[in-house]
Amino acid sequence: MGSGNLIKAIIRLKKSKQGTEKKKTSAVKPKKGSKKKGTSLVTRSEDWAATRIQTAFKAYKARKSLRRLKGIARAKLSTEKQSVKNQAVVTLRYLHSWSKIQSEIKARRVCMVTEWRLKNKRLEHQQKLEAKLHDVEVEWNGGSETKDEILERILQREEATIKRERALAYAFSHQWKADGKTQWLGSYELGNTNWGWSWKERWISARPWEVRYSVTPKKPKSSKTDSNSPAKRTVSLSSVPAKTPFPGARNTVKPRRLSFPGA
């Protein structure tokens, strides 16, 4: 608006200068000059009123647009706040549910692991019990036996195995004592017929898991024990007179001492 007013003022000044020049040149027609002065004043007041009206209208439009923009910004902020609140609530709800699900999964895994371990322990225990029952019921005859009778039979088996081992040890020691060649353990004597008992036969005969006897009723133990029984004897080869070693053997070889305690 300021530039337009300046242009108008410049135009008016030019017009006024032209009017004064015309007045000087022409002294005639004094009435026409007075009319032009009145018209110039009217145009100036109209222009000033138009500019005031235009500035007021433009200010009103600017205030209205500013108010509208402020309302839009306020509405956006309120909507964003509400959306942010809703989003935060939803995310918190999802996080809570997810953490709950994770805790349930973890508890379930721990429970499954503990159940698996307990199941394995139960299976191992059951297998042990089945093995024991199988050992007990190897010679099961389907008879009407009580618990005491079964336990008595088991004790008889154990005692019989112990007696058998002692008898075999005693017989082996006496057989070895009778044979003089067994004092020196040479590599060639393992295949000799006079050896009688090999290590394999001794190991098989001493196996406790095989039952090689018949079940007999338990007899009362006697108060006196035979001091010369085979179970109480121990035999050592150190008391046997040494013989000359076989040819080709070293002089540093010493006779071995073998003893079989009565256990």
From Swiss-Prot:
Residues 226-241 have a biased composition (Polar residues). Residues 59-78 are annotated as: Calmodulin-binding. Keywords: Calmodulin-binding, Nucleus. GO terms for cellular component: nuclear body. GO terms for molecular function: calmodulin binding. Its main location: nucleus. Belongs to the IQD family. May be involved in cooperative interactions with calmodulins or calmodulin-like proteins. Recruits calmodulin proteins to microtubules, thus being a potential scaffold in cellular signaling and trafficking. May associate with nucleic acids and regulate gene expression at the transcriptional or post-transcriptional level. Binds to multiple calmodulin (CaM) in the presence of Ca(2+) and CaM-like proteins. This is Protein IQ-DOMAIN 9. The gene is IQD9.
